[in-house]
């Protein structure tokens, strides 16, 4: 079913053509010398490989080329792409959207960065000049994503995202030796000398996105917060909630190693799905009337009901609503639901009545990382946030294909990898 959806998406993308983008092209020019580089590329469902691809060079005067020093795998969207469940990808696409590195080349119109600067790269690509960017709504940038198909599917388009299918601009990803970064002045954050790569890398997505989850949920001092999914985003959403003053953080998880991590390192109350069948009921036992904020950080692939497992299997829906339904049942009246996980299509039996009858506020969407860089740096420096807590495995670049499998199948305790590209 995923194969047919992906094929249809790619055909429609070609038929519709592409919008003009302000960076000139979402595809970088190859180095005129013919130089190549290593990159991790998609090779069909449940397959990635390391391949030699053309090295990028400056394509637009606002570009920089970053020599990658570290990258990682997103256990959410990268896993969805790896499995073939995220439509709009073709063999050979460079994966990844989380990286940091050193500026190796820069365009003539880049004024706030110099060759040799250490930078972390926002996963969402903004131009800095459109009406959305001027409102600091960078993840909605109107000029970096060339997909007409996204306009057809959703009525408008998202910003481009590195390594994230044709619907998000088909921009080559960050799991590569070199990365072309358009509009570098807004999309690169210079890393201070006291923030090493092992910490700064995770500003590219996890630390900013998890903070954004709390912003969407309007978490404040004294709140009770429940989080579905104890992957990196869920874990750090809980940590940010603690920093913001939450009185209780409840995590919901099924993988034993993640349950242990949430309890021991983060100090959450954890509901183990292996032991509890009715999660909302258990939450109501822990918090009278329900939590102030429910954060969904697990994603569209996860179903608890036979109905939605069958509907997804036969193509009657693309996204299971089971986790969101649990959120709606577990949150208090007038509470907040924050959907930070990936949802891309349609769901059946969505309980819209809960939203109205319980007076709920639901907010969602990708993170505008650029808004959070300064605050995250301050909290890393103070020691309130330690990105190293999530890293379960340190790997080399050639180990990425194996790490994709381990993360997707949740094997050997994999939660988050740190891929050192300096060795």
From Swiss-Prot:
Its EC number is 1.-.-.-. Residues 14-36 are annotated as: Disordered. Binds 2 Zn(2+) ions per subunit. Zn(2+) 2 binds at residues 127, 130, 133, 141. Keywords: Golgi apparatus, Metal-binding, NAD, NADP, Oxidoreductase, Zinc. GO terms for molecular function: oxidoreductase activity; zinc ion binding. Zn(2+) 1 binds at residues 74, 97. InterPro entries: ADH-like_C, ADH-like_N, ADH_Zn_CS, GroES-like_sf, NAD(P)-bd_dom_sf. The keyword Glycosyltransferase does not apply. CDD domains: FDH_like_1. One of its GO terms (cellular component) is Golgi apparatus. It is found in: Golgi apparatus. It holds the Pfam family ADH_N. Its cofactor is Zn(2+). Belongs to the zinc-containing alcohol dehydrogenase family. Class-III subfamily. This is Zinc-type alcohol dehydrogenase-like protein C1198.01. It comes from Schizosaccharomyces pombe (strain 972 / ATCC 24843).
């Amino acid at each position: 079913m995923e194969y047919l959806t992906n094929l249809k998406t790619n055909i429609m993308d070609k038929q519709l053509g592409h919008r003009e983008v302000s960076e000139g092209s979402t595809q970088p020019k190859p180095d005129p010398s013919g130089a190549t580089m290593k990159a991790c590329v998609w090779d069909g469902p449940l397959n990635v490989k390391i391949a030699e691809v053309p090295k990028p060079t400056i394509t637009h005067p606002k570009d920089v080329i970053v020599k990658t020093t570290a990258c990682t795998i997103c256990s959410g969207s990268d896993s969805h792409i790896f499995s073939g469940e995220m439509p709009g990808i073709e063999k050979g696409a460079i994966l990844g959207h989380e990286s940091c590195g050193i500026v190796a080349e820069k365009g003539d119109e880049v004024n706030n960065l110099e060759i040799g600067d250490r930078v972390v790269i926002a996963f969402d690509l903004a131009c800095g000049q459109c009406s959305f960017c001027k409102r600091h709504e960078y993840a909605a940038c109107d000029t970096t994503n060339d997909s007409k198909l996204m306009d057809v599917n959703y009525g408008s388009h998202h910003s481009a995202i590195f390594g994230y299918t044709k619907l998000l601009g088909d921009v080559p990803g960050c799991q590569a030796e070199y990365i072309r970064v358009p509009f570098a002045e807004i999309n690169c954050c210079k890393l201070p000398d006291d923030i090493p790569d092992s910490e700064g890398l995770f500003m590219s997505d996890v630390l900013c996105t998890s903070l954004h989850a709390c912003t969407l949920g309007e978490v404040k001092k004294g709140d009770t917060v429940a989080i579905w999914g104890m992957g990196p985003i869920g874990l750090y959403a809980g940590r940010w909630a603690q920093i913001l003053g939450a009185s209780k953080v409840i995590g919901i998880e099924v993988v034993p190693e993640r349950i242990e991590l949430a309890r021991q390192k983060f100090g959450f109350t954890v509901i183990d799905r292996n032991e509890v069948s009715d999660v909302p009921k258990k939450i109501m036992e822990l918090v009278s009337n329900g939590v102030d904020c429910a954060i969904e950080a697990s994603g569209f692939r996860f179903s608890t009901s036979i109905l939605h497992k069958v509907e997804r299997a036969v193509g009657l829906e693309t996204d299971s609503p089971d986790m969101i339904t649990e959120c709606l049942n577990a949150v208090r009246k007038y509470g907040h639901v924050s959907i930070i996980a990936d949802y891309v299509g349609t769901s059946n039996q969505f309980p819209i009545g809960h939203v109205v009858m319980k007076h709920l506020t639901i907010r969602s969407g990708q993170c505008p990382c650029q808004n959070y860089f300064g605050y995250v740096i301050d909290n890393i420096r103070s020691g309130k946030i330690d990105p190293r807590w999530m890293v379960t495995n340190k790997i080399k670049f050639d180990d990425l294909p194996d790490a994709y499998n381990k993360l997707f199948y949740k094997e050997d305790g994999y939660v988050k990898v740190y891929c050192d590209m300096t060795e």
